């Protein structure tokens, strides 16, 4: 193979990153995306069928000799300008056809193809024409968490989300819930970067072409659970969870339960104090969201026990929020307790954090995951008719682990399975495409993780196959 600098080297040497790379690449090519297809075949499936035969050698080279992100870029460029034109551009750059494959297998590929063919930057992500489309006007949303506390991180994220085809972003602030019941129960938002940066972030998202839902996101302060306690909190053993909460509260003298959707007060005075404190926390966010021009506001997240027990207090609070924020409102109910909530008529959307269990089987098939969505969404459709409100999946997502379909809310430090995460996304989007009464979804989570993304077991989708799946559905069709 003749390299661009004129050197001629054995083909294997042209791609080698380290002495063990070629055997590892062969194993990667032979590996399977869950129980579906070899990795290379999965990538080729993102291209229109007519282009697959001519694209196969180049894409397999890209996959074998670099990482999955480079292969995604190559697939995007090939779909944008067509394989013959792409290879012609690379031949012109590299000098010969065999070198075109070398260059296609590098980060240079997408930029060089666009430069030589005049394709726009960024290139649209390839659409799978055989798939059904999302309903017209569907809110193609992604959740972005302000944990980094930097507006420049938001700007870069919003531009990339727009390039993937997203139309909405849910900006999650990050605020700590105080340890005790002395006022204020909630930290003052103006002391936290989540509040200080909100206006700039909303404007950055708008500049990128995205609409914005502001979603205050509370976390606990003064208590850091162990890994075992986290497992119990997120698990399905309700007796173990109740025992753990009781034990921690006894140690801390705390009257509010630790889980947001399990909040309980000791007496009426504590309830009044809780609502006064929460109102003083959330109203500044509503005012700031209005001033920044945000398009939607979420009045609360996964505090369902308070909504069920104190509906009148929540209705009064919603009225106060409407006086500050003039756009549509929703509340984000948890997937396992939303049916007990009756105040949807006071809001504009039924909002659900949709971490529904879809399948108990390890590595479930696409059909099994879709069947899980059929079961989960049937009660929501009935509620939408009964309350006369459309539904938003205010959160939906899956960790990159083998149990993603069984417990989508739970993250574990285990071997990553990014292909099951992508399959869960595909099943979710197929389910949403058939349900026009669902007006949108905000997928959790757009957050950069420590590289390589291929080994990250979290919910984050940056540089993972799930982001490519999302872009196939969100992008131009």
In which residue ranges do the predicted regions lie?
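Substrate-binding cleft and catalytic face of glycoside hydrolase catalytic domains
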Residues: 164-183, 197-307, 401-403, 444-449
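Short inter-helical turns and helix N-cap capping residues of alpha-solenoid HEAT/ARM repeat scaffolds
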Residues: 32-33, 66-67, 98-99
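Aromatic-rich peripheral "rim/lid" segments of glycoside hydrolase catalytic domains that contact
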Residues: 124-132, 237, 244, 408-410, ...
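Boundary/entry segment of secreted carbohydrate-active catalytic domains
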Residues: 124-161
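Glycoside hydrolase catalytic-domain groove-lining segments
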Residues: 194-195, 200, 215, 328-330, ...
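Conserved hydrophobic register position within alpha-solenoid helical repeats
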Residues: 1, 10-11, 40-43, 74, ...
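Amphipathic alpha-helical scaffolding segments comprising HEAT/armadillo-like alpha-solenoid repeats
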Residues: 15-29, 49-64, 83-95, 118-125
């Amino acid at each position: 193979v003749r390299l661009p600098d004129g050197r001629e080297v054995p083909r294997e040497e042209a791609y080698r990153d380290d002495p063990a790379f070629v055997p590892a690449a062969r194993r990667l090519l032979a590996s399977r995306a869950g129980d579906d297809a070899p990795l290379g075949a999965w990538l080729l499936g993102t291209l229109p069928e007519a282009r697959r035969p001519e694209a196969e050698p180049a894409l397999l080279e890209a996959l074998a000799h670099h990482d999955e992100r480079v292969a995604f870029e190559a697939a995007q460029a090939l779909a944008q300008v067509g394989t013959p034109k792409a290879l012609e551009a690379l031949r012109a750059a590299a000098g010969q056809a065999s070198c075109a494959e070398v260059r296609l297998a590098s980060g240079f590929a997408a930029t060089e193809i666009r430069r030589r063919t005049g394709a726009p930057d960024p290139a649209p992500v390839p659409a799978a024409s055989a798939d059904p489309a999302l309903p017209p006007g569907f809110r193609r949303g992604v959740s972005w968490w302000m944990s980094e506390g930097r507006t420049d991180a938001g700007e870069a994220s919003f531009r990339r989300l727009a390039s993937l085809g997203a139309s909405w972003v849910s900006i999650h602030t990050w605020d700590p819930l105080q340890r005790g019941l002395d006022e204020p129960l909630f930290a003052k938002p103006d002391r936290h970067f989540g509040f200080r940066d909100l206006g700039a972030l909303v404007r950055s998202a708008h500049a990128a072409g995205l609409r914005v839902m502001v979603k205050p996101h509370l976390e606990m302060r003064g208590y850091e659970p162990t890994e075992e306690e986290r497992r119990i909190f997120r698990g399905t053993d309700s007796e173990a969870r109740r025992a753990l909460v009781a034990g921690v509260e006894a140690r801390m003298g705390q009257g509010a339960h630790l889980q947001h959707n399990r909040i309980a007060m000791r007496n009426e005075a504590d309830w009044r104090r809780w609502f006064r404190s929460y109102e003083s926390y959330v109203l500044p966010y509503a005012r700031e969201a209005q001033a920044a021009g945000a398009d939607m506001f979420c009045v609360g997240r996964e505090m369902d026990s308070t909504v069920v027990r104190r509906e009148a207090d929540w209705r009064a609070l919603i009225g106060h929020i409407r006086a500050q924020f003039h756009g549509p409102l929703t509340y984000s109910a948890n997937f396992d307790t939303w049916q007990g909530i009756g105040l949807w008529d006071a809001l504009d959307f039924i909002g659900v954090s949709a971490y529904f269990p879809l399948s108990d089987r390890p590595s479930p098939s696409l059909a099994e995951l879709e069947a899980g969505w059929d079961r989960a969404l049937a009660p929501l459709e009935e509620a939408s008719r009964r309350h006369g409100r459309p539904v938003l999946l205010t959160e939906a997502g899956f960790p990159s682990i083998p149990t993603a379909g069984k417990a989508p809310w739970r993250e574990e430090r285990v071997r990553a399975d990014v292909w099951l995460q992508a399959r869960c996304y595909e099943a979710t989007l197929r389910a949403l495409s058939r349900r026009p009464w669902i007006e949108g979804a905000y997928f959790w989570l757009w957050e950069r993780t420590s590289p390589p993304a291929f080994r990250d077991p979290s919910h984050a989708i940056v540089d993972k196959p799930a982001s490519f799946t999302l872009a196939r559905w969100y992008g131009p069709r």
